[in-house]
């Protein structure tokens, strides 16, 4: 019985240490599958989001943005939807990604085809966008199909990677990890309504604690996308709140700092 109480106390202490309140803003918001928005890039950018996601397919030498290969269009390239608009914003902001010099932005690129080949094309393409690769508050974070972790150091500083908790990273590898993402369903089936079950809270906060011990921010994908869930994720200390509802999350974060 004493052992059980000790375990619960430790878990509760972990939850308390993680769930310390901090100031949240739209910098803590992640636009999931952003290209499916009515105005890709601009809606999330204008809302001040800290992370914007684009899925890419390398087809005939072009990086095409789509959720499924069957949905690709030659007009919807990564360059047209994201790189060119970013370059224009950085020019307007005199070298910064946002008018606020302290505000950062991750462009999370989910490679749906071979990651090494896609990265070769991406790094070559980015060389023609000097303002992007020299912008200190902009990072390109590679997710999905990625190179081997041992090869991360071969890529330039402006290319970083989306990490996974189960991988045993060396310090050199870890230095190339910008964020750790994980599938929400591994830890909970809670749908964002009513209260988060205590057992799920323990699983989620234990994982969050492990990521924070690595000094990395965390994001869950396929998580509930409701105001109640957003509030819970804030209390748990999730660094990037995943959403398809840009305007709704923007309003929530502005009202509930």
Model-found features: residue ranges?
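Phosphate-group recognition and catalysis centered on beta-loop-alpha active-site segments
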Residues: 19-257
């Amino acid at each position: 019985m004493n052992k059980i109480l000790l375990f619960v106390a430790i878990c509760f202490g972990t939850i308390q240490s993680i769930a310390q309140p901090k100031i949240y803003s739209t910098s803590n918001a992640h636009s999931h599958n952003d290209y499916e928005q009515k105005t890709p890039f601009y809606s999330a950018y204008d809302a001040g989001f800290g992370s914007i996601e684009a899925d890419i397919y390398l087809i005939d030498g072009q990086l095409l943005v789509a959720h499924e290969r069957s949905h690709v269009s030659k007009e919807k390239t990564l360059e047209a939807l994201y790189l060119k608009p970013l370059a224009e914003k950085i020019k307007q902001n005199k070298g910064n990604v946002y008018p606020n010099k302290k505000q950062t932005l991750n462009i999370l690129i989910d490679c749906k085809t071979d990651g090494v080949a896609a990265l070769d094309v991406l790094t070559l393409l980015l060389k023609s966008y000097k303002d992007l690769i020299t912008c200190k508050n902009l990072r390109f974070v590679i997710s999905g199909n990625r190179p081997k972790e041992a090869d991360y150091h071969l890529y330039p500083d402006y290319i970083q990677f989306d990490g996974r908790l189960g991988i045993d990273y060396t310090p050199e590898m870890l230095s190339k990890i910008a964020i750790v993402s994980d599938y929400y369903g591994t830890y909970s089936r809670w749908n964002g309504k009513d209260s988060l079950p205590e057992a799920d809270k323990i699983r989620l906060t234990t994982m969050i604690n492990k990521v924070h011990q690595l000094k990395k921010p965390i994001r869950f994908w396929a998580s509930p996308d409701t105001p109640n869930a957003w509030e819970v994720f804030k209390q748990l200390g999730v660094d990037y709140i995943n959403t398809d509802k840009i305007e709704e999350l923007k309003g929530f974060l502005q009202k509930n700092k």
